């Protein structure tokens, strides 16, 4: 059954799902029109909101571009390629490859969502190289399906924000410790269930041998060696460019800072620390500054989609927030809930909002001020209410192509190649979330 659903969704998506940029533009227009219809906003005020928000995610967009290029450059270093090859050698058949990539991506995203997105796609590509007969789009989809675990992992935006002093909802619900969210029984159940169950779901998505998609072999070729051999009479400028001493000094500086950071903040990994770790590790493993720069240049081609689309989603987010549309959607689900059904209703409202605002932090700003007072009034579990917002966001990412862009950029594929598999994963993983929110 899962295989039939997967094949149907793949055909449907291939025919109807546009490029992610077109998707973002259509969402912009849809949000604009619905906000005019359901809220007291005027066309002029909506245009102003969109324009005011258009550049609000520049810093975040730069962070995401860096995590792609630094992660790609790190994975293209000889030591990391060797590690990925060793890990990928555990898969002997296409079925084993699919299950291994799903498991690997799920665990990696629990550790850190940025790390998981990048390294999961790198690992999937390595498995495709080593296992003949692999369906390459399915392997990349499996890496992205691992993203289902991120909101309940150590880098989950909403549980970390809810426990941070000064967050937008602290004056309503106080601080909610991670013991009630990340380390709660229901979150451990849901996260472990996703890690264990989803490899078997993706296993059943395997196409028939006759339906395996053939991929351009160029996509699976090994990257060129970025090292450069200098002649004996090389000028001082080139000697400096290929100097290992300079790399070691900068690497030591980065390691010293990271040691101080973790001693002060504990295991508080942010996107900035991930980028710094990727950059320092990549620099050291490529040995020389210019070898690393050549690796970065090869990786930078994959950032175009993110750089163009981030402003559109920033504009959508501000329209959702300032028009009141996001709060209106949240209130609709809250009004039909009781104490027992409140987490599930919050989960579905978050999933719906995620189409327009695919950002954990953005969800907390939009939904938190509505969800937390309602949870208090109904006597619902506050920690579970926080995680319900997070789960809805991470669940609907399977149908929202925005966060697939890093994996697709690394893989050299388009969104239509993987979203049929991802939507199938959405259908079956939803059961795990609902069970976890209902039974605990």
Located regions from the model:
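Hydrophobic transmembrane alpha-helices of multi-pass small-molecule transporters
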Residues: 1-69, 183-196, 200-305, 309, ...
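Flexible loop linkers connecting adjacent transmembrane helices
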Residues: 4-9, 45-50, 75-91, 125-135, ...
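Transmembrane-helix boundary/entry motifs in multi-pass membrane transporters
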Residues: 14-15, 51-54, 87-100, 129-134, ...
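Membrane-interface helix termini and inter-helical loops of multi-pass transporters
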Residues: 40-52, 166-178, 262-268, 322-335
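Juxtamembrane transmembrane-helix boundary signature
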Residues: 60-82, 108, 115, 288
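Hydrophobic alpha-helical transmembrane segments of multi-pass integral membrane proteins
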Residues: 90-123, 307-320, 334-373, 377-378
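Alpha-helical transmembrane segments of multi-pass membrane proteins
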Residues: 94-108, 133-154, 161, 173-179, ...
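Membrane-core helix-loop-helix motifs of multi-pass transport proteins
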Residues: 123-213, 403-436
């Amino acid at each position: 059954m899962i295989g039939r659903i997967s094949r149907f969704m793949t055909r449907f998506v291939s025919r109807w799902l546009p490029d992610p940029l077109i998707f973002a533009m259509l969402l912009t227009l849809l949000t604009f029109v619905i906000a005019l219809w359901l809220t007291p906003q005027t066309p002029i005020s909506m245009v102003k909101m969109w324009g005011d928000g258009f550049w609000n995610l520049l810093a975040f967009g730069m962070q995401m571009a860096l995590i792609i290029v630094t992660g790609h450059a790190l994975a293209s270093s000889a030591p990391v390629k060797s590690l990925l090859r060793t890990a990928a050698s555990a898969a002997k058949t296409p079925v084993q490859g699919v299950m291994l990539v799903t498991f690997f991506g799920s665990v990696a995203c629990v550790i850190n969502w940025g790390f998981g997105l990048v390294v999961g796609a790198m690992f999937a590509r390595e498995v495709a190289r080593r296992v003949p007969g692999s369906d390459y789009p399915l392997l990349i989809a499996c890496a992205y399906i691992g993203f289902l675990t991120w909101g309940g992992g150590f880098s989950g935006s909403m549980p970390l924000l809810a426990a941070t002093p000064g967050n937008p909802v602290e004056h309503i619900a106080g601080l909610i410790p991670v013991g009630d969210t990340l380390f709660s029984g229901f979150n451990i159940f849901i996260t472990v269930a996703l890690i264990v169950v989803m490899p078997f779901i993706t296993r059943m998505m395997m196409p028939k041998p006759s339906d395996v998609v053939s991929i351009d072999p160029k996509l699976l070729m090994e990257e060129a060696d970025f090292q450069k051999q200098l002649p004996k009479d090389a000028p001082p400028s080139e000697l400096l460019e290929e100097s290992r001493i300079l790399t070691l000094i900068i690497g030591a500086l980065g390691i010293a800072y990271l040691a101080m950071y973790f001693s002060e903040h504990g295991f508080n990994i942010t996107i900035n620390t991930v980028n710094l770790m990727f950059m320092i590790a990549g620099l050291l493993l490529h040995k020389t500054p210019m070898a690393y720069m050549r690796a970065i240049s090869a990786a930078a081609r994959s950032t175009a989609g993110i750089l163009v689309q981030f402003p559109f989603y920033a504009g959508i987010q501000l329209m959702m927030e300032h028009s009141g549309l996001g709060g209106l959607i949240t209130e609709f689900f809250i009004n039909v809930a009781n104490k027992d059904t409140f987490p599930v209703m919050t989960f579905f409202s978050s999933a719906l909002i995620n189409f327009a605002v695919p950002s954990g932090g953005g969800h907390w700003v939009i939904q938190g001020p509505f969800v937390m007072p309602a949870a208090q009034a109904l006597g619902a579990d506050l920690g579970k209410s926080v995680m319900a917002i997070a789960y809805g966001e991470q669940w609907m990412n399977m149908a929202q192509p925005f966060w697939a862009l890093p994996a697709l950029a690394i893989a050299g594929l388009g969104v239509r190649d993987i979203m049929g598999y991802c939507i199938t994963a959405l259908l079956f993983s939803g059961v795990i979330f609902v069970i976890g929110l209902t039974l605990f």
